[in-house]
């Protein structure tokens, strides 16, 4: 007859596969559930169940990789523990999972797997707790002295511990109240054992075998406590703890973490990790304030249960602090001659940037503790601002890290999040230092002019401390909450324009202008760098393709219109792809022709195109011979691959009537030529302006018409009715083509005056002249910016003469020598000089003297 201690479990049980810990009957374990099958079990069985039976599950140890997503069911341990699900707690951080608290009931053996999806269900056979021994005499006859010996060792172990500790008092009550046949399972769950040893206890179905396996574990624990008491400081006896001696490790041990409710063990691996982490922090040579913070956090970590969310946050913080390069640096390569050669090999032109880097190296040789400069490269896209930053790091022998700031609108991206927030992390500056592993890298702050602003703060304001040499030696990230020295970091910022950079941030940086390339510079860059790069990317060799300079120049002038070389690089890539197709087809035809045999009595004929010449990219028939190597890229090949030219020289065709002039404009993409068109009609003296003009440009137009009206008699300018009042019964319409593009600035003033003078005089402006400059009401020409980009735009358009303000004469030194030799520059200080240079034969003043009236 069964006693009250017997348990009856269902014949079919859903299986919970555990990768952490082994549950024994009579013990409690807390386990994390995150695999798909276990998640389905919790959601569909435990959370939706309404009866006690639905909370009974089978807990089976699974030694396979928990991260594997294999669809087939892994080989399971054949013996498991029937358990009662006591508590289910769900969480979404750091990923969706459940924490399950289960209590072991009895052992069972899997006889058959009934189904595997959505969670495994098995038919089981109960192995113990079927019927208890009816009396102590029967129990003693069954096991003899074995149970008494086990009980004696268990009592000895408990007596060696401090009874004031609640866990020890609870263990003592269990020894007095629990049946002896349950003690091996309970004690094994409490003392320190490996998963392999717990599996041996689980597999011990008979009581005799279970006692035999458990007794050596108790003896090992007792001997360890005796040894510890001998070596322990007597003064520390008042602070007794439950001490567990680590068993000898074996290579085949299964790594696990025990979450038993009564378990007082700390995980071996976590303990080792904390010790290693503490050593790393002490050896990191961090400053004293940071070290004090880390020591304090380690003490908190040791006292903190692993189940607390703050445990992982604190550990991540300490790991970051130990990995930061507080004192690790790289030695600068200070060979100026080698640096000059390396910079010249990597980048063509850019003389100003190279000069600044060499100056830094020279000063660095004379002064070792020089702070890193804060440089800002400003120029149009595609001119190599980002790549030259990488070359500077290579030249100095430093680590390089790029931080993309385009679109960043949260100041926490720079300064980090405070650790009180969920998902907090350090800012990009500290994270970049962790990645490179040294405290003197080259940091490239890319697209600093495209920073945003939102309710989360202004990242540009957060950069003020980072980019200030007087403050960044004490940069404080919100996540670290301790100061970090950034004074050895070489910061390089890139931008397309300084107009959108806050003045306070711009003042902290040394701005270096990176102008666009001339046609000759693009040609040189293409044949030095771009063509070889594209050939390597497409698996081609110079023996297979030839791109002469004439073809490259045609791509530059007729297929691209840019200050940099990105579009040119893409066009060269398109050519290489087309050639790769021809080369691959030719190899296929050669391979195919080797296997073709002519029929008997006939000769194999090969069709050779008449007038065959050196191969180009033009399409040939499928049965034509493979193209001859190398494939030459000429004008016809460019048209076949890239299509008709996208840009044509249209300057001369648009200056065929009065009232049209060419101005020069600067954009973030480089310089551009800008047409100004004017027309007049009968009206009421109104001036109409179109072409998406800004306020400054509108004021320049009104200024130009006012100056011409005041000087109309001087230049013999009249309206349609012959009046010197140019707006008398006359309306004027000024238009700036490319109406979808916003235009503003004062530099179009001279072009507007010239356009209106051409309109009212009926004379054509010279078709090869472009001009730029601000005007005043007195007829003076004031200097403007962007001279180099504007002159390069005029040179690209095929113009021959450029009218510039006289006070911009010093800017001509920045223009390449070959461009200066191709152009004629007219430096004008007044509008009189501008008009004389813009028209063939000059723009003469009134020469007829006034009639003298006699006063006699």
UniProtKB/Swiss-Prot annotation:
Domain Lon proteolytic: 655-841
UniProt motif Microbody targeting signal: location: 854-856
GO molecular function, one term: ATP binding
UniProt-listed Enzyme Commission number(s): 3.4.21.53
Xref: Gene3D superfamilies: 1.10.8.60, 1.20.5.5270, 3.30.230.10, LON domain-like, P-loop containing nucleotide triphosphate hydrolases
Database matches in SMART domains: AAA, LON
Region listing for Disordered, in residue ranges: 586-614
One GO cellular component term noted in the UniProt record for this chain: peroxisomal matrix
InterPro entries referenced in this protein's UniProt entry, alphabetically: AAA+_ATPase, ATPase_AAA_core, Lon_bac/euk-typ, Lon_lid, Lon_proteolytic, Lon_Prtase, Lon_prtase_N, Lon_prtase_N_sf
BP-aspect Gene Ontology terms: protein import into peroxisome matrix; protein processing; protein quality control for misfolded or incompletely synthesized proteins; protein targeting to peroxisome
Positions bound to ATP: 379-386
Basic and acidic residues bias: start-end ranges: 586-608
Active-site feature positions: 747, 790
Residue ranges of domain Lon N-terminal in the record: 13-222
UniProtKB keywords: ATP-binding, Hydrolase, Nucleotide-binding, Peroxisome, Protease, Serine protease
Subcellular location per the Swiss-Prot or TrEMBL entry: Peroxisome matrix
Principal location listed in the UniProt entry: other
Reactions performed catalytically: Hydrolysis of proteins in presence of ATP
PANTHER family: ATP DEPENDENT LON PROTEASE FAMILY MEMBER
NCBIfam families xrefs: lon
Family to which the UniProt record says this protein belongs: Belongs to the peptidase S16 family.
Role this protein plays: ATP-dependent serine protease that mediates the selective degradation of misfolded and unassembled polypeptides in the peroxisomal matrix. Necessary for type 2 peroxisome targeting signal (PTS2)-containing protein processing and facilitates peroxisome matrix protein import.
The protein's name in its UniProt record: Lon protease homolog 2, peroxisomal
The organism of origin for this protein: Xenopus laevis (African clawed frog)
Lineage: Eukaryota, Metazoa, Chordata, Craniata, Vertebrata
């Amino acid at each position: 007859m069964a006693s009250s201690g017997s348990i009856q479990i269902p014949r079919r049980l859903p299986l919970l596969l555990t990768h952490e810990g082994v549950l024994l009957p009579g013990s409690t374990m807390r386990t994390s559930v995150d695999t798909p099958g276990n998640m389905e079990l919790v959601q569909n069985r435990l959370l939706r169940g309404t009866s006690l039976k639905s909370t009974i599950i089978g807990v089976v140890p699974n030694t396979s990789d928990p991260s594997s997503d294999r669809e087939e069911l892994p080989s399971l341990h054949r013996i498991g523990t029937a358990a009662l699900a006591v508590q289910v707690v769900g969480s979404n951080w750091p990923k969706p999972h459940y924490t399950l608290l289960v209590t072991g009931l009895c052992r069972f053996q899997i006889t058959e797997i009934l189904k595997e999806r959505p969670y495994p269900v098995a038919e089981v056979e109960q192995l113990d707790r079927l019927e208890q021994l009816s009396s102590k005499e029967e129990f003693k006859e069954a096991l003899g002295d074995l149970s008494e010996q086990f009980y004696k060792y268990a009592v000895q172990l408990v007596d060696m511990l401090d009874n004031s500790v609640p866990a020890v008092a609870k263990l003592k009550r269990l020894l007095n109240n629990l049946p002896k046949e349950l003690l091996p399972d309970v004690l094994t769950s409490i003392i320190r054992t490996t998963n392999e040893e717990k599996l041996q206890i689980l597999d011990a179905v008979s009581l005799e075998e279970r006692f035999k396996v458990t007794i050596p574990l108790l003896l090992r624990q007792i001997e360890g406590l005796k040894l510890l008491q001998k070596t322990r400081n007597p003064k520390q006896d008042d602070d007794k703890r439950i001490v567990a001696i680590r068993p000898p490790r074996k290579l085949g041990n299964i790594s696990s973490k025990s979450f038993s409710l009564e378990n007082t063990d700390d995980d071996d691996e976590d303990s080792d990790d904390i010790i290693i982490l503490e050593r790393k922090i002490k050896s990191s040579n961090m400053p004293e304030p940071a070290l004090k913070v880390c020591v304090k956090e380690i003490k908190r970590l040791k006292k903190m249960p692993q189940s607390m969310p703050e445990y992982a946050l604190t550990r991540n913080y300490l790991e970051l602090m130990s990995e930061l390069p507080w004192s690790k640096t790289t030695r600068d390569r200070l060979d100026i001659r080698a640096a000059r050669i390396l910079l010249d090999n990597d980048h063509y032109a850019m003389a100003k940037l190279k000069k600044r880097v060499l100056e830094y190296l020279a000063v660095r040789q004379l002064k070792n503790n020089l702070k890193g400069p804060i440089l800002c490269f400003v120029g149009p896209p595609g001119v190599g601002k980002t790549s030259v930053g990488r070359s500077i790091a290579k030249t100095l022998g430093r680590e390089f890290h790029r931080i993309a700031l385009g679109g960043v609108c949260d100041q926490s991206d720079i300064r980090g999040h405070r650790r009180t927030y969920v998902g907090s992390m350090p800012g990009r500056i500290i994270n970049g230092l962790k990645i490179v592993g040294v405290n003197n890298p080259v940091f490239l702050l890319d697209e600093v002019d495209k920073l945003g602003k939102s309710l989360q703060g202004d990242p540009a304001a957060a950069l003020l401390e980072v980019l200030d040499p007087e403050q960044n030696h004490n940069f404080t990230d919100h996540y670290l909450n301790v100061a970090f020295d950034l004074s050895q970091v070489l910061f390089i910022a890139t931008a397309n324009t300084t107009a959108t950079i806050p003045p306070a941030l711009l003042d902290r940086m040394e701005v270096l202008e990176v102008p666009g390339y001339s046609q000759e510079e693009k040609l040189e860059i293409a044949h030095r760098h771009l063509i070889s790069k594209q050939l390597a990317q497409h698996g081609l060799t110079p023996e297979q393709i030839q791109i002469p300079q004439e073809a490259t120049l045609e791509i530059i002038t007729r297929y691209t219109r840019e200050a940099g070389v990105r579009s040119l690089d893409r066009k060269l890539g398109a050519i290489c792809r087309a050639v790769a197709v021809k080369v691959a087809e030719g190899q296929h035809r050669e391979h195919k022709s080797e296997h073709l045999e002519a029929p008997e009595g006939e000769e194999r004929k090969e069709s050779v195109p008449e007038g065959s010449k050196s191969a180009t990219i033009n399409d040939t028939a499928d049965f034509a011979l493979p193209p001859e190597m190398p494939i030459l890229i000429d004008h016809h090949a460019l048209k076949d691959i890239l299509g008709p030219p996208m840009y044509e020289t249209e300057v001369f065709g648009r200056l065929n009537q009065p009232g049209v002039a060419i101005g020069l404009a600067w954009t973030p993409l480089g310089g551009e030529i800008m047409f100004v068109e004017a027309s007049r009609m009968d009206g009421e003296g109104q001036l109409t302006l179109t072409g998406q003009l800004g306020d400054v440009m509108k004021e320049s137009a009104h200024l130009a018409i006012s100056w011409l009206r005041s000087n109309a008699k001087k230049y013999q300018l009249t309206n349609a009715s012959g009046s010197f009042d140019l707006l008398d019964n006359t309306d004027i319409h000024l238009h700036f083509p490319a109406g979808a593009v916003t235009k503003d600035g004062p530099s179009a003033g001279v072009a507007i005056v010239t356009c209106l003078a051409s309109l009212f005089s009926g004379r054509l402006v010279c078709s090869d002249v472009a001009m730029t400059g601000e005007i005043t009401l007195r007829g003076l020409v004031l200097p403007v910016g962007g001279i180099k980009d504007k002159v390069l735009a005029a040179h690209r358009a095929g113009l021959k003469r450029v009218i510039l303000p006289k006070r911009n004469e010093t800017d001509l030194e920045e223009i390449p020598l070959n461009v200066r030799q191709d152009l004629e520059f007219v430096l004008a200080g007044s509008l009189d000089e501008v008009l004389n240079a813009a028209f063939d034969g000059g723009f003469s003043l009134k020469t007829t003297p006034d009639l003298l009236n006699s006063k006699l």
